Amino acid sequence: MQPHLSHQPCWSLPSPSVREAASMYGTAVAIFLVILVAALQGSEPPESPFPYHIPLDPEGTLELSWNVSYDQEIIHFQLQVQGPRAGVLFGMSDRGEMENADLVMLWTDGDRTYFADAWSDQKGQIHLDTHQDYQLLQAQRVSNSLSLLFKRPFVTCDPKDYVIEDDTVHLVYGILEEPFQSLEAINTSGLHTGLQQVQLLKPEVSTPAMPADVQTMDIRAPDVLIPSTETTYWCYITELPLHFPRHHIIMYEAIVTEGNEALVHHMEVFQCTNESEAFPMFNGPCDSKMKPDRLNYCRHVLAAWALGAKAFYYPEEAGVPLGSSGSSRFLRLEVHYHNPRNIQGRRDSSGIRLHYTASLRPNEAGIMELGLVYTPLMAIPPQETTFVLTGYCTDRCTQMALPKSGIRIFASQLHTHLTGRKVITVLARDGQQREVVNRDNHYSPHFQEIRMLKNAVTVHQGDVLITSCTYNTENRTMATVGGFGILEEMCVNYVHYYPKTELELCKSAVDDGFLQKYFHIVNRFGNEEVCTCPQASVPQQFASVPWNSFNRDMLKALYNYAPISVHCNKTSAVRFPGNWNLQPLPNITSAVEEPDPRCPIRQTRGPAGPFVVITHGGRH
Amino acid sequence: MQPHLSHQPCWSLPSPSVREAASMYGTAVAIFLVILVAALQGSEPPESPFPYHIPLDPEGTLELSWNVSYDQEIIHFQLQVQGPRAGVLFGMSDRGEMENADLVMLWTDGDRTYFADAWSDQKGQIHLDTHQDYQLLQAQRVSNSLSLLFKRPFVTCDPKDYVIEDDTVHLVYGILEEPFQSLEAINTSGLHTGLQQVQLLKPEVSTPAMPADVQTMDIRAPDVLIPSTETTYWCYITELPLHFPRHHIIMYEAIVTEGNEALVHHMEVFQCTNESEAFPMFNGPCDSKMKPDRLNYCRHVLAAWALGAKAFYYPEEAGVPLGSSGSSRFLRLEVHYHNPRNIQGRRDSSGIRLHYTASLRPNEAGIMELGLVYTPLMAIPPQETTFVLTGYCTDRCTQMALPKSGIRIFASQLHTHLTGRKVITVLARDGQQREVVNRDNHYSPHFQEIRMLKNAVTVHQGDVLITSCTYNTENRTMATVGGFGILEEMCVNYVHYYPKTELELCKSAVDDGFLQKYFHIVNRFGNEEVCTCPQASVPQQFASVPWNSFNRDMLKALYNYAPISVHCNKTSAVRFPGNWNLQPLPNITSAVEEPDPRCPIRQTRGPAGPFVVITHGGRH
């Protein structure tokens, strides 16, 4: 793609402030290329080749579109900015902070407008990158909006640049309302800024053809008045028609009410348990005191969508059963509204459209839970920045419960509660890690979607599936124990696979006898009191541990050593036959081999300074 | 510096094999620059601007010279290769391995000779670097030898390149005896290779002027027949004249017998203890059964030199006392001969020349021992790759023992036994790490020298000095305990400082009562037998620990938590007054801030492929 040159292209020397910024890096930047003069009016941009779009801010001032070239390992971004602005910043950071961020900057000194690859330090101060890896291809002003087209390799090997991987990316943005004399004069703390989570590197999965008899069913909340609070989880119960026969869901997609694109953050459809005949109707906030407790039994995920996700197509050889006597007719829709500006009076009927067919596919797709059992035996001390808990699906369980031909995992949804920061599931065979099933090094509990895997993973009998979650409890004063509560923690990977088996749950937790040995040592070693009396519950015991470094390190040592209790279950209550207690931890001797990052060849890059993009002319 | 162009410069296209190698990296390398045609005879190279020289191999086939520009953060290397060779490789790796090394390659396909920045993978297979960071400046053939001049930045930010720091660097070399059709066809395992340890980044310390009355004294072994075994430590006892009055040593330097430069690896001069009137004379291998035990009391380092080191100048305000009634007249010289090719019949009189003066300087320089007490309480489990032990010089000790104005540390010698891999001493004040006193991330017990610090460090009353050593016990089957034996371990930093104080030793070890609690837990938790009977020694207790992950992790947790016994001593046997047992570990809340690596700007680099250096002409 060539830079789009408008009328009046010209060459220009940089202003003193820019020369200064560039010389800080020891470069004598000789010539700056003015690639566009402002106010190109009346010409529409060419039709968009960008399959993915998201609003960056709740007002819809900034909209991002992008496409991905896996061959070239490059992303093209198109950023559209509404209204007259002095400039904009866009970029990525570990968890959405404005500090230590990898940025592209468009700013003006009042005279000229510049584009540059930059970064922010730990105080939010902005600096020019040594390597200009974001490459501007086009800058276009249309009436009252500005459109920037630029590209960047996934990996730049510049230590100041974010490494774009296929997990969650925390995009950051900021709006500059006034000129700055130089890039170094800008600090992100003084700007109107925000973040948006997205998966940038969507997998390239071929789209199976839809059969002729495909039908659709919209699961949507009817005309909700979006509350003017930052976070609302809205719950709505609906039901399938009576005697609805067996179908296969083969695709689903989001339907978002026009104008609310920046407010609807993510949505999920759950099927209720089959153990109850009927569920009460409900339409209101999920945390409402009026919400019937029974709705907690509607937890079986049927569909999940999050901002930026496109339609979800099941592999052509599998479908998800919908209807029939064996499953509940009741469905729960949950919509997460994210309204940080407390916008009032907005009405919404967003939801999910299921595409289903009566022509059943050869395989039924199932969902299996991997990770940790929901139990307080697994706990995280307070004030930890990166504490890891691991759950195992052991070789003995896959040997017993999987078919000889194995299963294929094609999608995955990672799940923790509020302190989760990373999740990974790895497949191991014969004591060696073989491949990553799914991984998110920038996991956010506020951004949960079902992700198609780039490569489906086949799990054979005797394989081990290891799911690890990393937690940050810096802001907690007490230990965080495992459990269902929002202030308790989970570590789960819901894997979507076929053919469906009886195995619904393959998880583990530390053996409780060994945990009691831990509490005993804590007691003896520290000469301090940890309640080990018979009536103390495990959460009470954890609450009385003095969290010195020895007790923290010893808890990690325990979890890395002690035998486990394995839940190799048909349903949450029914285990496969056998004794699953005091199982040894899988002995894994080698880690997954990670390919080296491929640094791009830098032969074609531009000069190591900011580009002048727009010259306003006059005013010197 | 400009490339030296000889007669017949010409442009040439690469041979097919090279084109292949380059295209593997996706580069279309258009043009290769032939910068030298072979066999430039009769012209001497210009006078060498290189202050540092070392032989790379024991035969003296390869000799390296270098200089350092701290301003530009660049090293210039000159590599001289004797005899007709098909090529040579030179580079750096973590600990001298030929795998995962950062290399420059000079090789021929029989027709042309090429130069390239390359790297070896974990199997020793050689690949072209994406970034060509070694830049060839001159290649010159003089009669039967080849001289290469090239430069490289300290830090390249290419993940395949070694980061050159001011610690030990393990240089690697290899000689190519035959042509290879391409770079990728070369594997280091098939070559004649070796390693050499050196400090590349010597500090830029100004050289104080020598006074008029300076005298010299040579401490050298008389006409030693170098044994034809790989490793010999040669011991030689000599003495100062009777009634030798007080002087100050102000400089020392190595005197290496000509022709033995590649065999003399390092040398040290020790002063014997003053507690004995006389020591027996001795001249022989240090491990000889004939060596008198008394010589073990000659341990006070006066001078130390290792390969590549230049003369050692004391700061002009300090000198090391030599002579007088308060110190022993007896000196021990230790010479380490490294003779891996078992060369026979070589005679040697190498040693150290002390430069001393009767005009005493304002301050006496002293040596203080930091790190761990020599005690089995501090132990390393077997089969550990990176186990860290830490010794503390506490605020209470520096408060009591240092003068109000503090002391200045100007040099440091790090010391461990065979399993030591890294050593660092950090200064902390008010609970925060402030600066690194000395650090070697590529420490080798076989390369011990006294190093001048780039910046002298002032230690005030109340400061804490933390010395950590990292050990590798992969090849051990039993725990390695602290102690004097060569198979036991030490963690010591001998710091050279002024003004001299009474504090000779400021070290620590874990409290023995807490270690006994550890053995007790090991016993209870594992239901296994660890001997805790009264007659068991600590080494016996460590020998009976079953080294599962829990007991390993818990030992680390103990050393990071348990109180310590501090040795704040005037001499090894005399403590400063007070109770130094059960002291709390210093509470350090922040680490030393490390500056970001400065990646070089790559604007001026050459094409991303190998250079053709020499065209032999004809033969197609």
Swiss-Prot record, chains A, B:
Site (Cleavage): G42, S43
One GO location term (cellular component): chromaffin granule membrane
Organism phylogeny: Eukaryota, Metazoa, Chordata, Craniata, Vertebrata
One Pfam family linked to the record: DOMON
Chain positions with Phosphoserine modification: S349
GO BP term (any one): maternal behavior
Assembly and oligomerization: Homotetramer; composed of two disulfide-linked dimers.
UniProt-annotated binding residues for Cu(2+) B: H415, H417, M490
Pathway: Catecholamine biosynthesis; (R)-noradrenaline biosynthesis; (R)-noradrenaline from dopamine: step 1/1
UniProt-recorded name of the protein: Dopamine beta-hydroxylase
Topology in the lipid bilayer: Single-pass type II membrane protein
Tissues and organs where the protein is expressed, per its UniProt entry: Chromaffin granules of the adrenal medulla and synaptic vesicles of the sympathetic nervous system.
Topology Cytoplasmic: residue spans: 1-19
Catalysed reactions listed for this entry: dopamine + 2 L-ascorbate + O2 = (R)-noradrenaline + 2 monodehydro-L-ascorbate radical + H2O
Cofactors demanded by this protein: Cu(2+)
EC number of this enzyme: 1.14.17.1
GO molecular function: copper ion binding; dopamine beta-monooxygenase activity; L-ascorbic acid binding
